[in-house]
Structure formats: C-alpha cells, structure tokens
Amino acid sequence: MSSRNNNKLPSNLPQLQNLIKRDPPAYVEEFLQQYNHYKSNVEIFKLQPNKPSKELAELVMFMAQISHCYPEHLSNFPQELKDLLSYNHTVLDPDLRMTFCKALILLRNKNLINPSSLLELFFELLRCHDKLLRKTLYTHIVTDIKNINAKHKNNKVNIVLQNFMYTMLRDSNATAAKISLDVMIELYRRNIWNDAKTVNVITTACFSKVTKILVAALTFFLGKDEEEKQDSDSESEDEGPTARDLLVQYATGKKSSKNKKKLEKAMKVLTKHKKKKKPEVFNFSAIHLIHDPQDFAEKLLKQLESSKERFEVKMMLMNLISRLVGIHELFLFNFYPFVQRFLQPHQREVTKILLFAAQASHHLVPPEIIQSLLMTVANNFVTDKNSGEVMTVGINAIKEITARCPLAMTEELLQDLAQYKTHKDKNVMMSARTLIQLFRTLNPQMLQKKFRGKPTEASIEARVQEYGELDAKDYIPGAEILEVENEEENAEGDEDGWESASLSDEADSDGEWVDVHHSSDEEQKEISEKLNSMPLEERKAKAAAVSTSRVLSQEDFQKIRMAQMRKELDAAPGKAQKRKYIEIDSDEERRGELLSLRDIERLHKKPKSDKETRLATAMAGKTDRKEFVRKKTKMNPFSSSTNKEKKKQKNFMMMRYSHNVRSKNKRSFREKQLALRDALLKKRKRMK
C-alpha cells in the first residue's frame, strides 16, 4: 500500500521532477498544480517569514530543477526568489535561507539569471550571521566569476562587480568587507582579475580600521599568504603520476640496478615538473600595478606613525613601505628617522628592521639622509662591547645599504669597518671582508691601499657617479671583444654577406663535422693583451662602431657578458696576474629586487649551542625513539599479510609435508651421534 502511495505524482516531487525532465509537455497539468501550490505557500510565508517551512523549501527546489522546462510559466520565478531573500534575509530561518540560495545558484548555473544582480544580492547576504551560508556564497562567487571570464575577459560584468566590491570594502559590516576582500585576492591569485584596478581597490583596504582586513591586505602585498591549502580543487595535482605511484611500480617490479636508476631518474623528472608548475609568489607583481605609489606610501607612513596596532602589524606596515620605496625609488625622507628609533641590538625583531632599512635605500635618496642611518647602525651594533653575532649583523646591514646607496658611505667610517678584517671572531672578520670586497668594485679609492687588493681591469675602469648622475652610454660596454674575435673572419668574408651565409649553410648541411671555436687560456690571454694595449677612448670608439654596424645575436651578448666578467679577475695592464684564468659559470645568481633576511643574518661560522640546548635536543630524540626492533612499514596499512608472515604462524602439522620442509638440509647420522655423546657427557658431569 505504501509503494502505491509513493507513486502518486502530486505527493512525490522527485518522481514528478524526473518525469517532467524527460517529457515536459506530457506533465503540464501536474506542474501547474504544484506551481499553484507553491504560490499559496509563498503567500503564507509572507505573513510569517521567520517561521520554518519544509514544504516551501521542497517546492522551491522543485521549481528550480524544472525551471528550464517551462520558461514561459517560470519567467518571474527567479526575481520572486531574489525579492523574498533581499526583503527577509535577516529574519529567515537559516535552513530555508540556505535552500533559497541553493535554488538561485542552480538557476544561475542554468543561465536563467543575470550574474550582476545575483552576485550583488549574494554580497549583501554576506552580512548574515551564518558561517555555512557565507562559505557557500564565497565559493559560488569565486567560481561564477571564474566561469564568466573563462573564454574571454567579460569587462562589462567585471567593471560592475569591481565597483560594487569597492563599496563593499567600506561597508560597516566587517565580516562582509573581509569576505569581499578575500574574493578579490582569490580572483587575483587565479589570474582572473589581475588588472591594476583590482590592485588599487585592494590598496584601500590597507587603511581599514578593522585589523583583520588590514592584515589581509598587507599580507597580499607582502606575498606572505597563509599556508598553501592542498585542496582537491587544484587541477595540477591530478595530472601525471605521483611519487607514490613510482615507488609502488618499483616495489612490485624486478629489483635490479637498472630499474633503480630508472626510478631515480623518474623521481628527478617528477620533482622538476612540480617545480615548473609551482606558481610564483602571486602578489609581488601587485606592487608594480599601484597607480600612485608615492601617495600610497605617504599615507601608510602617516598611519604607521599614529598606529596603535600590535607590533606584528606595525612590522608588516614597515615592510610594505620599505618595499614600495625600494622598488619604485620613492622619496620618503621621514621613514628613515622613524626606522632609526628601533635600531637597537635589544630591540625585538631587529634583524627584520635592518632588512627594511636596507630595502628602503636606493641611489636617488640624498646621501646625507642615509649617512645618519649608517652611523646609527655602526654606533649601536659595530662596537666591541657587543657580541660577535650583533657586530656581524650590523656590518651585513651596512654592506646591503651601501650596495644600494654607495655615496652614503664616508671614508672615515669605511676605514674603521675595514679594520675588523683581522678581528678574532670569524663571523665579524668575514663580514668585514665582504664589505671590503664590495668597495673594491664600487669605489676602490675610498679604501686604504693595503685593502684595495690587486687592481683588475674592472677596478681601473670603475668610476663613482655623483648624486643624480646618469651614466647613459651610446654603445654596448664590452662590444669591442667581438671585433677582436671576428677580425679575421670579417677580413676573409665575401662582400655579399647573404651569399657567404648561404654558402656556409650548404657546406654545413653535408653532414660533416663543424669546427666550433673554443676559447682556451692562451686565446683569452691573447685577446686581453690586444685590448689592454689599446687606450680606453679607442676601445669605446670600437665598441660604438660594433654596436651600430651589426645586429648582435644572443651568442654575441653572451660573449660580451663573459668578457665583462673576466675583467673582475684579469689583472690590470702592467700588473702581475693574481691567479690563472678560471672559467666563470654563466648562470651566476643575480641580485633581485628584494633582499632576504639571510643576507642580514648571514653567519659564516655556526655558533656553539649551550648545554641546555644540547640536552633538550637529546631528550627530544629519546621521546620519539621506538623499540630497538626493525619493523617493516607497509605502504598500505590495511593490506593483507604476506605468505612469509602466514608461514611463521601456521601449525607445524600443516607444514609437515610441504616441499620446503621435506627438502630441508638435515643433520647426518654422524652429526647426531656426536651431539648425543656430548649431551651424555654433559649430563654425567652435572650428576657428579
């Protein structure tokens, strides 16, 4: 009887929904009956909107599921649903409100609602005190905007939504403003809204009174996102084999050295592939998209000076200001005295503050402003009353600041710091040596003669630029090396360059070996001698002639770069060579736009750990130590036991006639006889 009742269509909405989707015209009457029933429930709901209604929730989901089957009847259904939500969302029952939102999401997925109006409604619903609803709406907003811009950038919709989000960031409800900011950051991270307008809208959140919003915006610009969430949404993780697959494949296959090498090679390829797919720090490029970084930095500094936030938030503000000043080369002279207040060895997180001071230094800052900063660091850190680590950090900070603003260093201060080259502490000594090495390339004349080292070609050509001076060249420095290397080829070449090139191509295409020119030590020495014999002005003239007369290839630029690097090692004309010519790796590490904390905290000698630290490390190792038994760990803990394990636990009578037992090497008769004799002798001794 119950099964017959379940088959009645008016009371069984899932079955009716299934039949309508198969054949809509055949069930128009049943649909109209349910539609009228829905209307009457809506009228009842309007009288008491705060009352839960399970029947209305079922009817709303039913109408949303079949809305595409009867568009003429349900043309006003999406708008009615939006009106019900917008007028009553504060008093609605949470379950009914969630049902209405899910129905609207379903209608949006069927493209029956305009995205702009729906997303604006959902942003208003973020004010509701319903965490699950906010999470659902956040996911839908991000996914929907991603789908809107899937094929091409839909600027019309994007502009409307960005303007609306700009107003939402200034909303009085902190939760709604925070989620709006999270949406914009997530869309920027996914390269959907990666334009300047999005970035400049996010900059307004840096002046929010709400700490959570302020920290989220600062974190975005500083590139310190929270721990990467390894959700199932990440598409790149599902592609290709994982390390576990490779290990299982090796474990189940034949154990040989060849297969082991294959596994190692495959693991290397997998690691390389993962590194290639790993996205870069997504928000560092956002600093470059700010419209008016000078005004933005000034406002941030004003906020920092009057801020009453926690110390960590102040540190984030200082970090962002220093990055803005360093990257955009801004004039923010009040920032340096503000930082100087915190430059004390006992100051909390002082190494980071030194890093911010170095980041904010650049060649356009007047030297006298940076000089006071350098003197503060030198007086507070580089003194004999401090420990070796403190002095090392101070010298490292001075080195990084002067690398960006060389004119700030005075000759007197440099000579004082150079004296630490013979300090008893190895860390201080090595830091002083790196500072001396820096000024050997920047301005050797500031160093005492004994610290200048052997003069090289680069140090002879080095010239200190005055403040604000631009060194604009009309030639490529080092291009004269090409003329020397290609001099014989140019003399022997045909008048028609195109013809000679085609002839050489035909000769090379015969499949024979092609002579490749390798620069040996003798050839490099000969080239450098020829160049050294030329005056500096003649070198510049030849470099200008080469730069204007030919198009340089990538190989030519590589040769020029290597020649410029050789100048750092080759002795100056008339001086003895300090060491033999050594090969230079062309892929040397370049200095980036930002400093790392390691540049400030670099210690060449690891400090000794005290007794308490060593004891704590030893005790920590003992607590995690298991029994002294080697246990084979299974890759799958729920897998069945092996035949070898089962054999150990079997009854002997079951194993008695097995091949392993019968073919087992047993003792001979003589061995048994000797064993019996020894046993009897031993027993007789015990009896005595």
Curated annotation (Swiss-Prot):
Record's compositionally biased regions (Basic and acidic residues): 514-524, 668-681
Compartment(s) of residence: Nucleus, Nucleolus
Protein transport among keywords: yes
Annotated region (Disordered), positions in chain: 484-524, 605-688
Taxonomy, superkingdom: Eukaryota
Coiled-coil region: 254-318
InterPro entries tied to this protein: ARM-type_fold, Sda1, SDA1_C, SDA1_MD, SDA1_N
A single BP term in Gene Ontology: ribosomal large subunit biogenesis
Record's compositionally biased regions (Acidic residues): 484-498
Phosphoserine PTM sites in chain numbering: 232, 234, 236, 586, 596
Protein name as annotated: Protein SDA1 homolog
Gene name of the encoded protein: SDAD1
